[in-house]
C-alpha cells in the first residue's frame, strides 16, 4: 500500500478529511522550503503538494504565477525540488509528498530518469498538469514502474470518456477542480460541487480531493463535507507573497495561523 493510500485509508477509518496544503518549491527562498514543509505538517497537513517551478504555468492564477517567478529568480530547478524532498525525508518518513508541475522539465530530465530520482527522493505522486491520461503511455508507465501515484485533474466540464481514462490510469486520488478557471478563483457553488463530486464517485472508486477556491475556514468546512481531501494553495501562497521579505519564522507563523483555520474548520465538519 502506498503512503497516500495508507494515509487516506487511516483517515477514512476515523471519518476524517485530509488537509493538503500547496506551496511552490523555492518560494520565497530556497532555504525556507524544507522548514515550511515541516511546519505545515506540524499544523495539521496530512500530505503536502509541492509545486515545481516552470516558466509557463498555464493552469495557475496570478498568485501562484508570482510564486513561480520568485522561485525562478533563485534558479530553482526540478533537481533542486527533488533535493528538498530528500532533505524533508530525513525527518519525516510518513507524510506523503505530491509534486505538481508541467511536463517540460520532466521531459528535459527524461521521464524514466525523473521517475527513478523522484522515487529515490521520497516523492509519492506526480500531478502533471499538461499531460492528460489519454496521452503518453510511456510516461505514465515510467511513473508506475517507480511506484509513483499518478494524480489527474478533473473539472465540472470533464467528459465521461476522460473520467474513464482517469479512473484507469490514475491512482492515489483524483483532484477535482471545483471552479472553472485558474487556481485562486473565487466563488464556490456548494450544490454544484456536490452534484459533480457525486457523479465522480459513480464513475470511479478513487478518493476525491477538492481544490481551487478554498480560501478560508468557511469554504473548507463546506468542501470537507463533500471530499475525502481538501487542497489549499492560493490562500497560503498569497500569505507567503505578503510576507516574502520577512524571515522564515514570520512566514511559518502566518502560515500556521491560516492552517489552523483550515484544520479547525475541516475537523468541525468531520465531527458533525
From Swiss-Prot:
Write down a Pfam family by its short name. Trp_syntA
Q: Which InterPro entries match?
A: Aldolase_TIM (IPR013785), RibuloseP-bd_barrel (IPR011060), Trp_synthase_alpha_AS (IPR018204), Trp_synthase_suA (IPR002028)
Under Enzyme Commission nomenclature, its number is 4.2.1.20
Catalytic reactions on record: (1S,2R)-1-C-(indol-3-yl)glycerol 3-phosphate + L-serine = D-glyceraldehyde 3-phosphate + L-tryptophan + H2O
- Any one of the GO CC terms: cytosol
Query: Would I find Amino-acid biosynthesis among this entry's keywords?
Result: yes
Indicate the residues that form the catalytic site: 49, 60
Which superkingdom?
Bacteria
Give the Gene3D superfamilies listed for this entry.
Aldolase class I
* Protein keywords: Amino-acid biosynthesis, Aromatic amino acid biosynthesis, Lyase, Tryptophan biosynthesis
Query: Which pathway does the record list?
Result: Amino-acid biosynthesis; L-tryptophan biosynthesis; L-tryptophan from chorismate: step 5/5
Q: Name one GO molecular function term.
A: tryptophan synthase activity
CDD domains for this protein? Tryptophan_synthase_alpha
Q: Which family does it belong to?
A: Belongs to the TrpA family.
Quaternary form? Tetramer of two alpha and two beta chains.
According to its UniProt entry, the function of this protein is described as: The alpha subunit is responsible for the aldol cleavage of indoleglycerol phosphate to indole and glyceraldehyde 3-phosphate.
Name the UniProt record assigns to this protein: Tryptophan synthase alpha chain
Q: From which organism does this entry originate?
A: Hydrogenovibrio crunogenus (strain DSM 25203 / XCL-2) (Thiomicrospira crunogena)
Q: Could you tell me the gene encoding this protein? A: trpA
Amino acid at each position: 500500500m502506498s503512503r497516500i493510500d495508507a494515509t487516506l485509508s487511516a483517515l477514512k477509518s476515523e471519518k476524517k478529511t485530509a488537509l493538503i496544503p500547496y506551496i511552490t518549491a523555492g518560494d520565497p527562498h530556497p532555504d525556507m522550503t524544507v522548514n515550511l514543509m515541516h511546519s505545515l505538517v506540524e499544523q495539521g497537513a496530512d500530505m503536502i503538494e509541492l509545486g515545481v517551478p516552470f516558466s509557463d504555468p498555464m493552469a495557475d492564477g496570478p498568485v501562484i504565477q508570482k510564486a513561480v517567478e520568485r522561485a525562478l529568480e533563485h534558479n530553482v530547478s526540478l533537481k533542486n525540488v527533488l533535493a528538498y524532498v530528500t532533505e524533508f525525508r530525513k525527518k519525516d518518513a510518513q507524510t506523503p509528498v505530491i509534486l505538481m508541475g508541467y511536463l517540460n522539465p520532466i521531459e528535459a530530465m527524461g521521464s524514466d530518469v525523473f521517475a527513478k530520482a523522484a522515487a529515490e527522493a521520497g516523492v509519492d505522486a506526480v500531478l502533471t498538469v499538461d499531460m492528460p491520461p489519454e496521452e503518453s503511455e510511456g510516461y505514465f508507465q515510467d511513473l508506475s514502474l517507480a511506484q509513483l501515484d499518478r494524480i489527474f485533474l478533473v473539472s465540472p466540464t470533464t467528459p465521461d470518456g476522460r473520467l474513464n481514462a482517469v479512473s484507469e490510469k490514475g491512482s492515489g486520488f483524483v483532484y477535482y477542480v471545483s471552479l472553472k478557471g485558474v487556481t485562486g478563483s473565487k466563488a464556490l457553488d456548494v450544490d454544484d460541487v456536490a452534484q459533480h463530486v457525486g457523479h465522480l464517485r459513480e464513475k470511479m472508486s478513487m478518493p476525491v480531493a477538492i481544490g481551487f477556491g478554498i480560501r478560508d475556514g468557511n469554504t473548507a468546512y463546506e468542501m470537507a463535507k463533500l471530499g475525502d481531501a481538501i487542497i489549499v494553495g492560493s490562500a497560503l501562497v498569497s500569505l507567503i507573497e505578503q510576507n516574502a521579505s520577512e524571515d522564515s519564522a514570520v512566514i511559518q507563523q502566518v502560515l500556521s495561523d491560516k492552517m489552523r483555520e483550515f484544520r479547525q474548520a475541516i475537523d468541525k465538519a468531520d465531527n458533525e
